From Swiss-Prot:
Pfam families: Redoxin (PF08534). Monomer. This is Peroxiredoxin. Its EC number is 1.11.1.27.
Amino acid sequence: MTMEKQVPIVTFRTRVRDESISGPNPYRWEDKTTDDYFSGKRVILFSLPGAFTPICSTFQLPDFESLYVEFKKNGIDDIYCLSVNDAFVMNAWGKSQGLKNVKLIPDGSGEFTRKMGMLVAKDNLGFGLRSWRYAAVINNGVVEGWFEEEGFGDNCATDPYGVSSPQNILKCLKAPAFV
């Protein structure tokens, strides 16, 4: 569960709301780096196979959102959800979920996921390359806690979920032995 690994340096292509743009799509491109997300703070990063998928949309993302205040009370500055989806998909998913606290990171090309060693094929589901489900506690860009679902591998027939749940991570954060 504990490890000392620096997160890879990656640039993410994001879409951010811009009030100066009128019309139905008032967003502009903005590059954000891993430093923008992880430097100088202690965060939770959780990664999942895809936006709008059942476990991700029914349990994992909503539960992180609802437990946000509890995470803040336990020393977490921000919570990020990452998926190998583009910025348009991630923005639409966030809007459909009514997010107020959890921030979404689009890893459209899968570069971050690949450099973390978590890129898997999900061709059996028609997804292509996606992230294996995991979560991490990251302190100033260094992974200090690791929560990876069992069964890592290409075209896994199941979608394990539990180890990377917000409830499990919160329990670990509250434990005296956690870093």
